[in-house]
Amino acid sequence: YEIASCLVGSEMCIRDRSAQRMKDVAKLITGDRKIVVLSAMSGTTNSLVEISDYLYKKNPDGANEIINKLAMKYMGHVEELYSTEEYKQKAKELIKSHFEYIRTFTKDLFTLFEEKVVLAQGELISTGMMNLYLNECGVKSVLIPALDYMRTDKNAEPDPVYIKEKLVKLLADNKDADLYITQGYICRNAYGEIDNLQRGGSDYSASLIGAAIGAEEIQIWTCLLYTSPSPRDKR
């Protein structure tokens, strides 16, 4: 396998439209068999942090305003990204489900645990949208949820034995796919709670995945530029 870590409309590429950026990324990753590690779309993480800040301050109205703006932004991306009504509808349902989930956190006590769940939605949405787009284009891609294999131990360090065991099985269960789409940065902790790797973002996730499966190459793509660190280069 090759591993490709891609920033989808990264802050460095803020002038790019995120839907067009996703199309550009799709062109880059198709071809050889790859595991593709994606970030959240441009501006999404900042908005999710802003939502969390409002909820910490017990200001659900402020949070809902940002949620609604972000949801509308994604609905606009759907119209630009997909060409068929079937896939537009699938993408809208995906986005609706994630934002309805985010809204549930405006009603109860908000802690660090809830914040990590909210922040994870950016990567979950971007990978879901990318996988749908690739499927619409006729690419045999499969979504491999990072929350099903990426885990940290009780010291908040990656658990390489667990990662390898779970990831190898997931790949074997989907061996007919040409592309595997997964999330960067997010994981579960030793207690099964949604968490994050705290550093390195998608690049760090890509290195952990590469080390787990003995990848031939890891490509780190940012604004159409890339570097190729060793699979054991866990920056």
Positions of predicted regions on the chain:
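Structural motif
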Residues: 11, 33-36, 117, 140-142, ...
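Alpha-helix capping and helix-loop boundary segments enriched in small/acidic/polar residues
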Residues: 16-20, 39, 61, 65, ...
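N-terminal glycine-/serine-/threonine-rich phosphate-binding loop
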Residues: 10-35
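Single conserved hydrophobic/aromatic residue that forms the stacking wall/gate
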Residues: 1-9, 14, 226-235
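Glycine-rich nucleotide/cofactor/substrate-binding loop typically near the N-terminus or early
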Residues: 29-133
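N-terminally biased helix-coil "hinge/interface" segments that flank
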Residues: 82-83, 91-93, 123-131, 139, ...
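Active-site phosphate/oxyanion-binding loops
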Residues: 145-177, 183-228
